[in-house]
Amino acid sequence: MPILQVIVLAVVQGLTEFLPISSTAHLYLTSWLLGWQIEGLDFDIALHIGTLLAVLIFFARDWLQIIAQGFGIRREGDRELNHNHMLLWLLLIGTVPVGIAGLLFNKQAEGAWRNPFVMGFMLIVVGVLMWIAENAGRQQRDLSSLDLADTLAIGTAQALAVVPGTSRSGVTITAGLFRSLTRESAARFSFLLSTPAIGAAAAKAIWDMHKKGGGLHGMLHADFLVGVAVSAITGCIVIAWFLHYLRRNGLRPFVYYRILFGIIVLALAFIRRPA
């Protein structure tokens, strides 16, 4: 794969994985419109590892505190996390629905559903739900008050992200708003919840490569390393910017973008069918 293509797609992944606008749709449609082929599991692994590194690096202190408190070890840190010692177990429970959905619908997600008609439809539907949540949610709670019901609701929403065009961050932030979390807390929990899911996706891709006769040594080439680095750096920048943005701003620009982008995707799908 040409290095320019690697960089462009890795930037697209890093930008769109953590914004509520669907990384899958943007990667697929960028490649489709530019006539590029995303070849090989190694590149898919690179993007997954890059975005996994982004959340692990950015939330490293949070994860250390969450894990320590989950095992009864007192660790001073973030105020919200200090008041919720069950967060580790809530995050693990919240990951179960997407794991089940991935096992049940992986073939559809990688096959029949991966087309611009499905993506355009889901971009619009989740955009409308995000608009409703933005206006209906009370946005009064933070992570200190998160409970099992919240986790199950947000975790179940994350399971919908197996459908391309949904956006993992978009649907989980929307669910968080419906549970009356503040925008920033909903996004923060969304990113923390994404960590096990992204890690599992990377592990599955590595296992699939192993079954096809590949190995880790085959991934350690320039394209792979550039893809990991670019998507990780871009992802860290986007997470920092987005959390800062949500402290004072709402999600309406992303709602409008999703709906407009969804309409454009559907229009292009009718005009020009993908190969």
UniProtKB/Swiss-Prot annotation:
It catalyses: di-trans,octa-cis-undecaprenyl diphosphate + H2O = di-trans,octa-cis-undecaprenyl phosphate + phosphate + H(+). One of its GO terms (cellular component) is plasma membrane. GO terms for molecular function: undecaprenyl-diphosphatase activity. The chain crosses the membrane at residues 1-21, 40-60, 85-105, 117-137, 189-209, 224-244, 251-271. It is an enzyme of class 3 (hydrolase). It is found in: Cell inner membrane. Keywords: Antibiotic resistance, Cell inner membrane, Cell membrane, Cell shape, Cell wall biogenesis/degradation, Hydrolase, Membrane, Peptidoglycan synthesis, Transmembrane, Transmembrane helix. Pfam families: BacA (PF02673). InterPro entries: UppP (IPR003824). GO terms for biological process: cell wall organization; peptidoglycan biosynthetic process; regulation of cell shape; response to antibiotic. It is a multi-pass membrane protein. Its EC number is 3.6.1.27. Bacitracin is thought to be involved in the inhibition of peptidoglycan synthesis by sequestering undecaprenyl diphosphate, thereby reducing the pool of lipid carrier available. Catalyzes the dephosphorylation of undecaprenyl diphosphate (UPP). Confers resistance to bacitracin. This is Undecaprenyl-diphosphatase. It comes from Solibacter usitatus (strain Ellin6076).
